[in-house]
Amino acid sequence: MTPRRKAIILVSCCLSLLIVSMDATIVNVAIPSIRADLSASPAQMQWVVDIYTLVLASLLMLSGATGDRFGRRRLFQIGLTVFALGSLACSLAPTIDTLIGARFLQGVGGSMLNPVALSIISQIFTKPVERARALGIWGGVTGISMAAGPIVGGLLIETVGWRSVFWINLPICAAAIILTAVFVPESKSQTMRNVDPIGQGLGILFLFGTVFTLIEGPVLGWTNPRVLAIAAVAVVALIAFLRFESRRHDPFLDLRFFRSIPFTTATINAISAFAAWGAFLFMMSLYLQGERGFSAMQTGLIYLPIALGALFCSPLSGRLVGRYGARPSLVAAGILITTAATLLTLLTATTPVWHLLIVFAVFGVGFSMVNAPITNAAVSGMPLDRAGAASAVTSTSRQVGVSIGVALCGSVAGAAMAGSGTDFATAARPLWFVCIALGLVILAVGFFSTSQRAVRSAERLAPLVAGAPDPVNGAHVR
């Protein structure tokens, strides 16, 4: 395969990452405009964000297995098409309920993109050096999309309207579909994994039940029969999931992974960091445009330090992990996220913009330091043929974290969610204390995850899971 064709394949894969990553920051900037135009309640606005991330979390691992079985290029093209249709439906949504349904469709399409694109990259770039370079470019696109998202979103919302933040996905999807059809070869795994529909279904029940309880509990009342019933379903689903998966030969989630302390702590850190991230983005959009009266464009500019932190500090974090291990980056991330959340407790209706920019910069740098050590710790000590599966679990954990973070906005800061006014900052303060706790978890786990005991636990796990089927490696390309 020629270098030119490989480069075009990488571009088509990166386009999928661009739309999925940019969607997070763009939609958060649009939340106040959507709320005003569609007369949405606070809980409905949480669902606009959470239905997308929940579907991503629920289907990421299944999409990887499906691509292995039926063809990665085929599933990638289907994912792009479904994501484009979901984006079109979002842009035309006449009601908030229709928008939530369209976001569900968007999430289904998005779940087929990044895991399959990574698998395509792994099969096309076979030499270690070129694969590392390709994955470095892939990681850089995340920073670029985060940097572009708030600015592009703010500009589009201010000049065209909030519906345009979904229109922008359509030409990108079209370009990716054409490039994939022309240049990407079909590939399938030599080892077909069995699909685990029962485990998958129980996991989905648990995730949706938990988030429903957190979002609707403050609205309907924590003792409301429907809230209690769905909370009970979530608990039963979790218990059944753990029992079923522990007995299955080829489970949806290999619970033995959690015998590795580095893997377990990586999962905890992924959920903690991304819960803080989801809560921060969602609540600050309401604060900036509702409490402070900033325009969507001004809000996008205030978000910029976060994106710049990701763009410039993510590569630094990767180098630190490569040279010194996960601990320095995790400790730095924990300290910075905790510091940013502490500064957020001081917010008022008249906090100077320079103070906000400092908070966003500190949070952005802290958040950018956490991704590389999470991935590194997740695969630490894992056999090569299980690294993809371990990494997929942490990718899912990231989306679970965002869903929980957004859901907590209503549970912990319901008064602030109910409307703007001079009490917004005060009502939101409990949420920032939760973010402080999440930052401290990252800090504490950062020390523990790299201890000698942790290393030994990973070494003991490796022979137990070696040779099990993995969704990433061993493809036949035709």
Q: Where on the chain are the PLM-derived regions?
A:
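Membrane-interface helix caps and helix-loop-helix hairpins in membrane proteins
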Residues: I96-D97, G161, K188-M192, G217-T223, ...
